[in-house]
């Protein structure tokens, strides 16, 4: 949840600034943010609690939180893991599966995600 435009590539910034662009976030990403907040790895002066942060995701950042449906778990169960780059993060795999199942593009700066394009991931790479 960065408002630091230096962390976004010009292409991603342009896409995000389009008025008709609707932004979504997986419940798995929200879960990761809550864990980071509770472990003091994520902070913001405006958030007093993790719940405040979740409200901010929707109300300040205008992201729609998408629940993980069982169909996502079927995609996840079939996902071939990027062992070449030792990509073993199960949360990343759920987020990738979520995007693939819903046929939605995924914005990420993680170079390991490119591997999943051949399985159906539509990746918008954010080159920092």
Task: Identify the meaning behind each predicted range.
Residues 37-64, 71:
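Active-site-proximal, substrate-binding regions of enzyme catalytic domains
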Residues 27, 58-83:
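Acidic catalytic patch
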Residues 86-87:
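Residue-level "hotspot" positions that anchor or transmit function at local structural transition points
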Residues 1-26, 41-52, 128:
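Short, well-structured N-terminal submotif of metal-dependent ribonuclease cores
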Residues 90-91:
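Acidic donor-binding loop at a coil-to-helix junction in glycosyltransferase catalytic cores
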Residues 94-128:
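Acidic, PIN/NYN-like endoribonuclease modules and their adjacent C-terminal/linker elements
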């Amino acid at each position: 949840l960065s408002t630091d435009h230096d962390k976004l590539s010009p292409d991603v910034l342009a896409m995000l600034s389009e008025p008709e662009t609707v932004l979504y976030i997986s419940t798995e990403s929200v879960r990761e943010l809550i864990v980071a907040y509770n472990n003091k790895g994520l902070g913001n002066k405006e958030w007093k609690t993790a719940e405040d942060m979740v409200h901010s995701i929707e109300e300040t950042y205008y992201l729609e939180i998408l629940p993980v449906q069982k169909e996502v778990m079927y995609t996840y169960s079939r996902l071939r893991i990027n062992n070449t780059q030792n990509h073993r993060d199960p949360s990343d795999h759920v987020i990738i599966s979520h995007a693939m199942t819903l046929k939605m593009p995924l914005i990420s700066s993680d170079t390991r995600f490119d591997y999943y394009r051949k399985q159906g991931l539509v990746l918008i790479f954010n080159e920092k």
